[in-house]
């Protein structure tokens, strides 16, 4: 029989390896996606918790806002460079700036802007006077509760006033005044602009009106006189001093002035910097920097949004003055904390007060959030001590747990914790394994599935904790754990943590106590049987609780001292009652779980592909061969041997020739 290998099989094996590699590759990708999704979900859950905490702190910080001034300037005067703020008291004050004798300006155009807040009906805010004997002046004042400006540059007093709305409402306002010759504009906040123009359009027009009534021979001298007078009508000559507060004129201003600007001079800033040309008299206080409650950044009475100077917001010509509505300050006045300067009163702008010297008058009253003492954290793994109410009395101290105390405790009434009825409590009851951790629980409380945030007892792992959650609780002292002195199934000496199981007698004795007074069970041994010591056990993972025969695992409470302040859900199984309360579950990381699942899925897929390939290749012909099914019958012995041999030789030659021809044809 002639067998030959078909070369077409080799190319057929390459796709199998390719599929195997592709399956492994896609399995890794799936596992990566799985792990990333798990990590994202865990991150979102953790971020939700942190967000809740953050929101809690945010609402808490709302009661500790930074002290702000009662009166706050709008955007036009905001910023550290915009201007200082002074408060003028009841008795009045004066800030006087005097130009040097050789540096007194004469101006054709003036710009004045100031922020203020007051409740007085009459008072002078700012007055600029020329040198003695000239009589030129410019005065910003409040009359009958309305703001106005009066100026005289050589002939008559020119008045411009805001008639629409009073400004002595205690709110903060910004007034802007511009003068160009005899033309003037006045604007308060973003209200409509008030304008003033002389009767004649130009000086020449006024001269032509007067020239008709003057004799011809006097025209020339009158023209020269009018031209000289015209210069006096447009120029504010030899300005000498700026008086702020009105005390020198007997019209006292009471309230707050901020960011005074006049022709490039920031007078209040200069006063705050102790400029030698400025004198301050009377009841005038500078609103200085108030330290922040948080102790991070200093805060002044002027909000930080004031970033533009008054110069940038003043108008120059009435015809081109346009104002947009200003947005209100981002910091709104609340009733939480209102602090202006150094006085604790709300109307200290008008009442004299002294700077705070540590007394109660200058203190900031900060409301504190006091939480309900009953709402203590569900799991306090690092709390050193929680004070017990006086009504709570200890029932058992685990540090003093001995054989005698355990035997006495076993006689007390305790509820049946097994799934069976009141008459069926036996050795199959639930084993309590607290390992002396100070866990307390209420057996009358139903087990819940949302112990992540609401639990019924506290867990102590590596520090002493005195705690009590419910009425009638006890004090538990858990010493610091170490792996070398930790024995899960041995009653240790005084001061050692212990682990026990509930005895059947103890369980049966109190099957019907759930409807009565809620008992409190300490996490410790309830019987006094001495068990064999076990080898040293590492805390992670915690050893499981054993029954009395130490051979069968029985639904332990899974705890982990490495989880700090992270309550987790209590795992439940069908048919098994858990101790209500919080218990921490040791979980693998999401990324590891996803990777393992992906690798297992990829391996299973590869195995299936290999099995399928083996099944296919098993049923496939592995080579080409030919079977000669011709039948040769033995002739009678009477026939000659020569004839038979010839036939055999011919048949063999013909068959070999056909085979050779077929092979040659096949390979070609």
Curated annotation (Swiss-Prot):
Subcellular localization(s) per the UniProt record: Membrane
Keyword Transport tagged: no
Residue ranges annotated for the Laminin G-like domain, each copy included: 84-284
Keyword set includes Amino-acid biosynthesis: no
GO biological process terms, semicolon-separated: angiogenesis; cell adhesion
CDD domains, sorted: LamG
Extracellular side of membrane: 36-593
Membrane topology: Single-pass type I membrane protein
Positions in the Cytoplasmic compartment: 615-668
Keyword tags: Angiogenesis, Cell adhesion, Membrane, Signal, Transmembrane, Transmembrane helix
Segment forming the signal sequence: 1-35
Region (Disordered): 510-529, 636-668
Gene Ontology CC annotation, any one: membrane
Source organism superkingdom: Eukaryota
Pfam families documented for this protein: Laminin_G_2
SMART domains, sorted: 4.1m (SM00294), LamG (SM00282)
Membrane-spanning parts: 594-614
Protein modification: Processed by alpha-secretase leading to the formation of an extracellular soluble protein as well as a C-terminal membrane-embedded fragment (CTF). Proteolysis of these CTFs by gamma-secretase releases intracellular domains (ICDs) and extracellular peptides.
Organ and tissue specificity: Brain and arteries (at protein level).
UniProt function note: Neuronal cell surface protein that may be involved in cell recognition and cell adhesion. Plays a role in angiogenesis.
Family stated for the protein in its record: Belongs to the neurexin family.
Protein name from the UniProt record: Neurexin-3-beta
Gene it is expressed from: NRXN3
């Amino acid at each position: 029989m002639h067998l030959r290998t078909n070369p077409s099989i080799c190319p057929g094996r390459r796709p199998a390896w390719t599929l195997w590699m592709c399956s492994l590759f896609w399995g890794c990708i799936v596992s990566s996606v799985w792990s990333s999704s798990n990590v994202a979900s865990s991150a979102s859950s953790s971020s939700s918790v942190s967000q809740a905490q953050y929101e809690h702190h945010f609402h808490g910080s709302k009661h500790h806002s930074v002290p702000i001034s009662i009166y706050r300037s709008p955007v036009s005067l905001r910023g550290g460079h915009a201007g200082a703020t002074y408060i003028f008291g009841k008795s009045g004050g004066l800030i006087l700036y005097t130009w040097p004798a050789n540096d007194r300006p004469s101006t054709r155009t003036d710009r004045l802007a100031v922020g203020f807040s007051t409740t007085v009906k009459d008072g002078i805010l700012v007055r600029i006077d020329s040198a003695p004997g000239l009589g030129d002046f410019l005065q910003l004042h409040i009359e009958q509760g309305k703001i106005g400006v009066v100026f005289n540059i050589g002939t008559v007093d020119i008045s411009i006033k805001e008639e629409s709305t009073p400004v002595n409402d205690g709110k903060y306002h910004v007034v802007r005044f511009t003068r160009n010759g005899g033309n003037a504009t006045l604007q308060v906040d973003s209200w409509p602009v008030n304008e003033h123009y002389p009767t004649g359009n130009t000086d020449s027009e006024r001269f032509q009106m007067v020239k008709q009534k003057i004799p011809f021979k006097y025209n020339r001298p009158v023209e020269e006189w009018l031209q000289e007078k015209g210069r006096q009508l447009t120029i504010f000559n030899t300005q000498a001093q700026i008086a702020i507060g009105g005390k020198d004129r007997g019209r006292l201003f009471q309230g707050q002035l901020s960011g005074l600007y006049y022709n490039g001079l920031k007078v209040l800033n200069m006063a705050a910097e102790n400029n030698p040309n400025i004198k301050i008299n009377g009841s005038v206080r500078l609103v200085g920097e108030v330290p922040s409650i948080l102790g991070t950044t200093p805060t002044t009475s002027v909000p930080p949004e004031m970033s533009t100077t008054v110069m940038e917001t003043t108008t120059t010509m009435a015809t081109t003055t346009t104002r947009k509505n200003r947005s209100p300050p981002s910091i709104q006045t609340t009733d939480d904390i209102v602090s202006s300067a150094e006085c604790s009163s709300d109307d200290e702008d008008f009442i004299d007060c002294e700077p705070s010297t540590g007394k109660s008058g200058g203190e900031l009253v900060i409301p504190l959030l006091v939480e309900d003492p009953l709402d203590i954290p569900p799991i306090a793994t690092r709390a050193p001590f929680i004070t017990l109410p006086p009504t709570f009395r200890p029932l058992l101290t685990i540090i003093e747990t001995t054989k005698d105390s355990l035997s006495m405790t076993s006689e007390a009434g305790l509820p049946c914790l097994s799934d069976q009825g009141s008459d069926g409590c036996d050795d199959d009851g639930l084993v309590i394994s607290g390992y002396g951790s100070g866990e307390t629980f209420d057996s009358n409380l139903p087990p819940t599935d949302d112990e992540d945030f609401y639990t019924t007892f506290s867990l102590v792992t590596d520090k002493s904790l005195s705690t009590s959650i419910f009425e009638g609780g006890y004090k538990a002292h858990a010493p610091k754990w170490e792996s070398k002195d930790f024995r899960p199934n041995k009653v240790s000496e005084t001061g050692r943590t212990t682990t026990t199981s509930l005895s059947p007698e103890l369980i049966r004795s109190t099957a019907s106590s759930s409807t009565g007074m809620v008992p409190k069970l300490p996490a410790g041994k309830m019987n006094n049987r001495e068990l064999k010591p076990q080898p040293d056990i590492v805390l992670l993972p915690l050893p499981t609780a054993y029954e009395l025969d130490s051979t069968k695992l029985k639904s332990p409470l899974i705890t982990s001292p490495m989880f700090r302040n992270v309550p987790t859900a209590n795992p439940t199984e069908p048919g098994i009652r858990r101790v209500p309360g919080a218990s921490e579950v040791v979980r693998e990381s999401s990324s590891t779980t996803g990777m393992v699942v992906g690798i297992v899925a990829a391996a299973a897929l590869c195995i299936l592909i290999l099995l399928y390939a083996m099944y296919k290749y098993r049923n496939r012909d592995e080579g080409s061969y030919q079977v000669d099914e011709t039948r040769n019958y033995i002739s009678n012995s009477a026939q000659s041997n020569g004839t038979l041999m010839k036939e055999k030789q011919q048949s063999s030659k013909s068959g070999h020739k056909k085979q050779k021809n077929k092979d040659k044809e096949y390979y070609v």
